[in-house]
Amino acid sequence: WEVGNIEKNVHLQNQLVEQFGASGRKAYSILNSTPEEARETAGRFLEKSELDYDLVLFDLPGTVNVPGVFQSVINMDYVFTPITQERMAMRSSMSFVLAIREYMHRHKDVPLRGIHMFWNRMDKRVSKDLYNGYTEIFRSLKLPVLETVIPSAERYKKDSGMKGPLFRSTLFPPSSSAMKGSSLDLLAAEIETILKLQ
C-alpha cells in the first residue's frame, strides 16, 4: 500500500526525500518469487547488482506444505521461525522445525547452518506456566529459541502511517514512539549476533 499512500501524502513524500535524498542511499530491493525459485531469483539479482550485500532476507510461507518451501529452507544459511502460544500454530511450528532438523542430521552437506525459533505475538495475559512449559520442551529437544520475545500489539496488525507514527513499512524505519516496547530492535540485535554481522 505504501507507494499509493506516499503519492497522496505530502508529509510522507517529504520524509522520503529527507531519508534518501540527502544520503544518496536507495531503498532496499524487494523481489517477488515463488518458494521454488526464491534462491535463484536472489542469485540472479545479486549477480547483476553493483552493490555488495551482507544479508539477503527471505520471507517464506509458514508451512512446509507449500511447494518449494522445504527445499528453499534447507538451502538457506539460517532460518528464523516465529512461534506463538496458540496450540495448533505451535504444533505446526514444532513439526516444521523438527522435520528440518532431522533432514539436517541425515544430510550433512545442506547449506543450512541453523534454525532458530523466536516467540512472536506473545500475549502477556497468557499464563507464564504455558510459556515455561514450552520452553522446557524446547530445551529437552535441544531446539534453539532466541531470548527476545515479540509481544502481541495492535501496531503489528495495522499501520497508522497516514496520520500517525509509522511502524510497518518497507521504506521507512519504525518511528521511535512506535518501536517502544516492540522488542524488534532487540530481535534484530540478537539475529545480528548469531549471523556475526556486528
What kind of feature is each model-predicted range?
Residues 121-168:
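Beta-strand-loop-alpha "switch" segments that mediate conformational coupling across diverse proteins
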Residues 7-8, 63-65, 87-89, 103, ...:
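Catalytic P-loop NTPase motifs of RecA-like helicase/translocase cores
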Residues 158-185:
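C-terminal boundary of histidine-terminating zinc-finger modules
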Residues 93-109:
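Conserved C-terminal guanine-recognition region of P-loop GTPase G domains, centered on the G4
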Residues 1-57, 62, 161:
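P-loop/Walker-type NTP enzyme "switch/lid" segment
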Residues 67-87:
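Inter-motif core of Ras-like GTPase G domains
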Residues 58, 81, 117-119:
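Structural beta-sheet core signal
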